[in-house]
């Protein structure tokens, strides 16, 4: 296949001026198979020529030139005929006459056997003279073929001394054929010399004490060169946007990064009705799996059957098994570490007070540190519960997919949450947290897996069931706690049900009116550690609006601390919220209609869920629902 040819006629000529010699006119023909890879998009390469260099071993290197100025574009990535990539970088090259070569340091060339060569510039003193093989060129210059010792044996260095005048060199060696010498002459002709001002073609002043020379590193099959290895891991490409300055190893990675500044998202999802766009092809590919349901990355841990859409999600999940927390909080004196950078980013906002996600509901005004908490909060206003359990006879609905995901364990014998101290397993993360506090004195919060692990499968969540909701909103300085809901849902054709949701969002139980009436009018509080606390029932407390203070009574009859009870009347909401605003942790009742529900907050911040009147206790409700669904009564360790 003819990729390049030398021609002395005037048609299609390109000049390569040499120092002290006449300019050569070279006509170079490019095959259509060569393309330019700009990022991930292939485009035809126009106005580009290749110059052939035949090496001593019989292989041919093709040097690429732009027909306009004879040079490549800095940072350009070219994809050659065999599918491999070549990478280009410009740097000045000092030489003895005060000028520099026009060849680019790090310029990539593609060899005939599919290997990639990179052009480098090395001072003469760095060569081992015994490893040099010299050839005399027609114009009087000398070329040296150098097998350098500082590169792997699979590599070969071809060094060209462009201004040498050594005479009497033996060129009859069988390893140096006439075609090689001819190619080296063409290569040496690229030297651009302007002796009048000592300025190179790149505008850089050369150093007189150094000789002009260049070398080609021929990379063998065993150690193929990539842009990263070519630069020895250096990050040479800097983002030029104000305030950024990030560095990258390749021009392509820099270009992808710059899309975060420009907002460019060239990869658009073509799934019907989607229309989402992404900055990278990998992002689009990962997103498309939300439509197909494909999860090719499976956890290899014993007894774990989880799989994920991306390798990054799998890597985050594996840390839940290993306990690895590589992302440390940079705030001095904190010392906490996290499984993902995103959790750490949200955590840092507890130090800075930043809450970038604002609720747009009129009259609300709440703000959140994380997008997840914001989205969950918005559903308080909309009443949306799009995620329904598909187990026959269950039909429970949830505002977020993560709650549905965690709910599924009640239908199995799975206990996915394990203690990193003793190895015990639990169905609920809240029970695991209680175990770690009581058994191991470990109060470190347990980060939930991120929303990427709990994304709904395609098509789920379209059927939204709305109903009246009674919600208490937790106001805690510096931390975001997802609002807890006790939702009363009425569905056409069904009897009224009450869904009881625990503080950590892991227990969701539907109770019929008949079951509620069977429980009676007791008032029971269940603390986070599972201790039931009974409060004496007073008709005045239940029926009247406003805030009341009562003493908690333990199951043994011991009177405990004072708690505030917020009555269920909507008209009392503003009064209750103002009176409780001075407490360290306060709960406010928000309801769309009067329900016999009471919510309390203790002065020391203990999270307590209280069920009043016709509603059962949370503990009893769970037992009733479990008996109905599974025919068994779970214990606390479940």
UniProtKB/Swiss-Prot annotation:
GO cellular component: nucleus
Residues with Phosphothreonine modification: 352
InterPro entries the record matches: Znf_C2H2_sf, Znf_C2H2_type
SUPFAM superfamilies: beta-beta-alpha zinc fingers
PROSITE patterns per the UniProt record, alphabetical: ZINC_FINGER_C2H2_1, ZINC_FINGER_C2H2_2
Residues found modified as N-acetylmethionine: 1
GO MF annotation, one: DNA-binding transcription activator activity, RNA polymerase II-specific
ZnF C2H2-type: positions: 237-261, 267-291, 297-321, 327-351, 357-381, 387-411, 417-440
UniProt keyword list: Acetylation, Activator, DNA-binding, Isopeptide bond, Metal-binding, Nucleus, Phosphoprotein, Repeat, Transcription, Transcription regulation, Ubl conjugation, Zinc, Zinc-finger
Cross-referenced PANTHER family: TRANSCRIPTIONAL REPRESSOR PROTEIN YY, ZINC FINGER PROTEIN 143
Assembly notes: Interacts with CHD8. Forms a complex with HCFC1 and ZNF143.
Protein name: Zinc finger protein 143
Organism: Mus musculus
Organism taxonomic ancestry: Eukaryota, Metazoa, Chordata, Craniata, Vertebrata
Annotated gene: Znf143
